[in-house]
């Protein structure tokens, strides 16, 4: 842990502390996940600060484990290349961008499905629309993590990676492209409760930021 770059290490620590703090607070009747998770912007529980705080909330152990594993594996490399300030900026912008895309997707869904109703029939019965909208909460660092994956694939496109269950190494750029295509297909064709378009949003904002930095520094190819 002492060998980790500063921002990567602190991101891991903060996320883990928030995760365990969430469960401790629950025992005292405090729902931190609801307070800090990202609500739909038309819901009464929404506030702008949630675009940052939602990144530090996670739904369960597997959720935080895989996100933090990716931060540890790829984030430390990016921080060593970019430095702490640029890496933290990138991480936060990807996470915020993912949240904005999630809000946009939910808004489109709201306009096409819910906007003409005053209440919604759920598993718990019929509830008012405002109460239903407050249930639409997004949590997790996955948007920022997908931005990290994109950046790694752009900075080190030909790095060899072993990905289960593929029996042979693949280049990082193909790994990233494959993940993006998978997220798009899942976003279009599944209803699994995962914010797939938010993941793509993190990658999109990461791409925009990297291209901007490249042009600001004198241009050149996106991949090197």
Task: Cite the ranges covered by each PLM segment.
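A detector for small-residue-rich transmembrane helices and their helix-helix packing motifs
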Residues: 1-224
């Amino acid at each position: 842990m002492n060998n980790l770059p500063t921002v990567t290490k602190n991101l891991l620590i903060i996320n883990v502390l928030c995760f365990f703090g969430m469960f401790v607070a629950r025992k005292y009747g405090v729902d931190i996940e609801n307070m800090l998770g990202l609500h739909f912007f038309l819901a009464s529980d929404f506030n702008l600060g949630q675009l940052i705080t939602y990144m530090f909330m996670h739904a369960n152990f597997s959720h935080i484990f895989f996100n933090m594993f990716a931060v540890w594996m790829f984030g430390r490399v990016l921080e060593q290349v970019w430095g702490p300030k640029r890496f933290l900026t990138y991480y936060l912008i990807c996470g915020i961008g993912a949240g904005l895309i999630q809000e946009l997707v939910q808004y489109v869904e709201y306009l096409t499905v819910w906007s003409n109703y005053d209440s919604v029939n759920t598993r718990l019965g019929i509830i008012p629309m405002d109460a239903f909208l407050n249930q639409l909460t997004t949590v997790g660092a996955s948007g920022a993590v997908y931005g990290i994956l994109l950046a790694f694939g752009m900075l080190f496109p030909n790095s060899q990676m072993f990905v289960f269950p593929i029996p042979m190494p693949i280049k990082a750029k193909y790994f990233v492209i494959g993940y993006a295509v998978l997220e798009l297909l899942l976003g279009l064709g599944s209803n699994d409760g995962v914010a797939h378009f938010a993941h793509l949003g993190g990658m999109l904002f990461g791409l925009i930021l990297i291209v901007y930095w490249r042009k600001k520094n004198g241009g050149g190819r996106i991949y090197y």
